[in-house]
């Protein structure tokens, strides 16, 4: 809902694109800060407590940008919204790890698929309310009320929390993040940077590099996001059969191939195929990384997920920002080979998702299937 109202709020506050771009960095900074703080609280009080609390915070903060009167108040509103969004993100993913543990099979990608579907639904509803002439305060306020009510009503259905008070089995407080988690976080940065590039530059690629009309160019993001949603609906079955390593390895490889096809294509139809292949390939990568991080240590689910999600989110923010300056030294389509290389690296190092054989603190309630694809 917030994304749909960006142009209207930007005009109402009276800031230009340049200033608004800087203000959006506060949204990202708040999200990363919220993710890191949420990880500690989740390990102390459990995801069952943090999910509804963070959902209420995020929902209530949704109306704040619509109430902003200048750049300063908009920046403060975006910072608070970012904290709420980041806190909710880690809380939901941590609880999804608990759900996987109960089912004893992969379900993380399904959660991410419903997130994508929710974004589509919110965009449609937001567009409709704008068409009715609703002000941002009214439509975002209604969305905030809906979010708070949904958080309260669904809270009893959440699984009992695994509060660990941030300690290991031996009672010692955990102060260091394992190297394996940081490696997963680095892979999340690479994959989510590639997603960010597709989200923000695929439409501009068709318009500026292939001279497509604005209406036709919009299909680039549509092809990418649709393929990603469908891929996430199927990724859990693939992970259950072939294992998470195969999902990340061959998914990242397909993502690299799709991005390369889009970058090198001289025609709009083949470029759309490339963006769709990229979306399908990348669809299951991030869920597998989040799941593996959460299952690494039952005493630090929140902390580990927050590290991977936080660094991944930085990649999502950095990717689009890096492409812009690169266009001053090379054509736009050639800049896409940066995410191509990163996806190739992710594919080559996917073995990090394998369960360490000598790791007494590693708990994987979702048994990894034999990796028939390597």
Question: What does each of the following model-derived ranges do?
Answer:
Residues 61, 72-81, 258, 269-277:
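Paired small-residue
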Residues 33-72:
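Conserved MFS/SLC helix-loop-helix module at the cytosolic interface between two early adjacent transmembrane helices
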Residues 34-46, 130, 231-244, 327-328:
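Helix-to-loop junctions at the C-terminal end of transmembrane segments
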Residues 137-156, 336-352:
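Symmetry-related core transmembrane helices of the 12-TM Major Facilitator Superfamily/SLC fold
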Residues 3-18, 200-216:
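Short amphipathic helix-loop junctions that connect adjacent transmembrane helices
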Residues 28-29, 116-121, 225-230, 313-315:
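Short hydrophobic/small-residue motifs within alpha-helical transmembrane segments
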Residues 14, 46, 67-72, 211, ...:
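Helix-breaking motifs and short loop linkers at transmembrane-helix boundaries and internal kinks
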Residues 87-101, 284-297:
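Intracellular juxtamembrane helix-capping segments at the cytosolic ends
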